[in-house]
Amino acid sequence: MGNREPLAAAGQGTAYSGYRLRDLQNVAPTNLEILRTGPGTPMGEYMRRYWQPVCLSQELTDVPKAIRILHEDLVAFRDRRGNVGVLHRKCAHRGASLEFGIVQERGIRCCYHGWHFDVDGSLLEAPAEPPDTKLKETVCQGAYPAFERNGLVFAYMGPADRRPEFPVFDGYVLPKGTRLIPFSNVFDCNWLQVYENQIDHYHTALLHNNMTVAGVDAKLADGATLQGGFGEMPIIDWHPTDDNNGMIFTAGRRLSDDEVWIRISQMGLPNWMQNAAIVAAAPQRHSGPAMSRWQVPVDDEHSIAFGWRHFNDEVDPEHRGREEECGVDKIDFLIGQTRHRPYEETQRVPGDYEAIVSQGPIALHGLEHPGRSDVGVYMCRSLLRDAVAGKAPPDPVRVKAGSTDGQTLPRYASDSRLRIRRRPSREADSDVIRKAAHQVFAIMKECDELPVVQRRPHVLRRLDEIEASL
């Protein structure tokens, strides 16, 4: 049987309002100051003040790699000495692409007339020119400082006199034995709608929990589902951090009558994010990040998530993660993270990629109808707008990164399990879970002032105190 004919009154309120709402779909994009990232744009210049991943180390072979980052066409390569170069793609001589250049012992040589550039863009040789040519003193190839770390290639694309130190956080090296495995995921949409997805934690209890067509293959459905407590609707709060240069959310869930799980994920402006355990509610008393990533614009309608999966016995004691499945445009958790699935499968088992990219190349914020669950997304946009407008104080992470004396920097992304008995009413139980979450966040902030060797013992001791008080 088909649908009945609508009642005559339908469409006067909210039912069958397609015709009435049709023209409203043609709104212009808003928040352009944080969506556009080309040279000279507010967000583009802001992002250029930070080190950005541009490719994976495994992509640098014996030939150059053409890349596009922040609207700039570039070429990345590793010369035979092992030094990494990130140069403007068009040769300074006559514009031939250096993606066809020949990697040298030192630098790269253009295939057209043999101009030879070092990784810093210095012209080393122009073979067809007279020996006394002054070109080497007056011409250079556009180049950006670059380095490799744990399988990612980073470049700094901003003003030379404002280049910051690269911040090294606790989770990059701790606990002992941590392995950072690089990955990338390509998204055919603006960077911000992907970045916002990370702070929109409510979707983990919905999109990632049996949001599948009835009768779909059980193995496929399980692969798209977050296990171990993620299906419980979280009690969430969002808080600015780092003098409004970042934010976190706390998500509290009850796991049993006697146990509560507190999860914290953190964003660092402009485009860095760190998440705690991914495969399940971490069974440890306290564990750190399981993933760090940057959402890097290619242009305004394409972006790439570059990052590391953190592998260690603390965040993945059951060894469910699969290092071999991380790499170029692939990652080892949750079906639906990449663009490589058959269309019918994406309809039956939609994932992050489908939910994010289907918003359009640039999501139209003017069409949104936000609710209370969207507070974090709108806080993120507000912080970004203030940052590009110069309203935020200096980023303390940038300041501390240059004066750590070899100490890694603390961050807050973590999972903690607390023995807290269930309260008689749902409201009272929600209140105690929220209180515990706020106290866990306060504990993590206390570590800002502690040397690295004291941070974990301090957290564990203070978690005991929270349990005793609640």
Curated annotation (Swiss-Prot):
Record's catalysed reaction(s): tert-butanol + NADPH + O2 + H(+) = 2-methylpropane-1,2-diol + NADP(+) + H2O; 2-methylbutan-2-ol + NADPH + O2 + H(+) = 3-hydroxy-3-methylbut-1-ene + NADP(+) + 2 H2O
Biotechnology: Shows a biotechnological potential for the synthesis of enantiopure short-chain diols and unsaturated alcohols from secondary alcoholic precursors.
Disulfide bonds: none
Keyword Transit peptide on entry: no
Cofactor(s), by name: [2Fe-2S] cluster
Stretches assigned to the Rieske domain: 51-155
CC cofactor note: Binds 1 [2Fe-2S] cluster per subunit.
Inducers of expression: Induced in the presence of tert-butyl alcohol (TBA).
PANTHER family linked to this entry: BLR4922 PROTEIN, IRON-SULFUR DOMAIN CONTAINING PROTEIN
This protein's name: Tert-butanol monooxygenase / tert-amyl alcohol desaturase oxygenase subunit
Organism per entry: Aquincola tertiaricarbonis
